[in-house]
């Protein structure tokens, strides 16, 4: 695997003080705050930040909301008029003023060369594949000439609309399309507290038809059913089928997305209704009896192998994103106009237009952000992928069973991961297979590349080939849920068994490793660091036997993120207890060896190369001593090795700053391809009165980092799906930097904010490293191949 990857830094001077300039926020805010370095990932209770991507703050024309006059109980009905309707029965066109320009686009956009090196398998971006595998079924849609098309957009506006008007923006794009009479563009609206336009009702769910630049309300439903209830989706599709029959159907689901684990949707008006998982989505589209030209997700993270297989019997193509989507989302005007001018246009050409416009518009208005969108042939995927995936799963299970878990773990951690800080455990399937097999001609790789007919990404997204897959590593508590989903959607049983094998060995390594979420020992007066990971063989036997038998205490299970309801996967394995015990005993990081030598000159950590091979990541943590407790400065993946291969302590005591103000910074991800490295992290703030995270990116053209934008910081209990709502930082934005605050006993107490507001000026805020002058101590977090976290002894500033 090689050693973990750091990034460079250049210290620009001494920073401003943090101590004595702030006050407590009062309340826990967003996320999980039970550990030092709460945003770093890889610990036992990782902060479940809901990753999001770039949006532009929109000023929406306001006006009186439309009143709904004709609603019926329990169903959809025709609507005869509206107080906002014109004499022709159509609602007025919604519009917005010119979008504000953003600061810092030059720095954020000039990354054309970053991430261009793809590992092993050739870059498949921007190449339209018109071939069809001989075993693929016939397409459901066959052009006849003069085709009629019904496009169904299921638009759950949620907080994306309430806060940012994102759904309104896309409705405007639809009204600007030249829609012909043989295209029925139908939109179901709901799921949001406040629509940011004067047409769509915030009281009732509604159906609109968009034509001639206007929105005509067709039906409403004042019962406001949850849009994550599959029955609501079924009713919308049935309405469209019964009233706008066509020989070509297209379905787009608009909202948050959470990938294979969570599925689609978050209804802001029905927040306790959860999401619509893949099994429910599959059941809904199956129930309507329609065969679709394509099913698209204008939502995050839904381009998964599981999504594709679940829908392969009901649609010819899938259009979706592996990564989180920018708030700009799909750009609707052009492809709808193209479809109207030729309703028999090939889905390959139409899908290519959707993908190209999405990437190009994102590059224009969300520069510097990671974007992906792919067009997948479900007919071909159904014929080719299941057998090759089954073979890959058997081979991988064989590695795990034959003392090569570390090989699989290395491949998993090295693979392109999506929404990494959210711990949804989705990685690019092609990249995963290549990292494990080192063969670009592997049947699974070739079957996926064959099914992905068109794929594009932003230039900073390498190793994203069009379809991701769930592979557990960060959150073992989700394995049982995915096993259930796999059964419901008919996923390959060999893959299901393999991930349970992997999770079982990982859980065993975690319970034996006994890593620590926090460096509590080092900050409460015991400066010896972690002592876990040094159990005797007898201890290991006992721990593994208790874990696998289900007799381990609830407290011990909680230490590895599990409880008695989420350990079913432990019973589905081919490995004996003895095999597991022997492997873990021979492949573990003994944390007692994480001790500083040469402590009073340049402290260093010495491990053998075999021990370094057990380390998957290293992050530096800094705590400021406030006098009554500690201010947490976060986790940064900066570290250096000397000529002997020993890791050196940071004797400079430098930290990331924005315009010379040291800030709490949490490393999210590092992607390395050849000589190119891209590191992404977040800075928690209050942005214009709302919780948010500034996004910092280090890359080849910006080795000292730049501010790429900001994203909303959701509370972990709000939704498991992922929002598409990052924004550029613009002149006049008001920022207060916030830091987690802990007592001397290691207990999280509150968030500490700088009272002085930082107001963004005409030039982009500058990211740099500065010397920290406040009293501080540092420690390093080591994460091993089982995702255990260990901490070095603390080093106090002199």
Where are these regions (language model features)?
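N-terminal targeting leaders characterized by basic, low-complexity, disordered sequences
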Residues: 1-40
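Hydrophobic alpha-helical membrane-insertion segments, chiefly the h-region
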Residues: 55-65
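Catalytic-core segments of thiol-dependent peptidases
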Residues: 190-289, 299-300, 305, 322-323
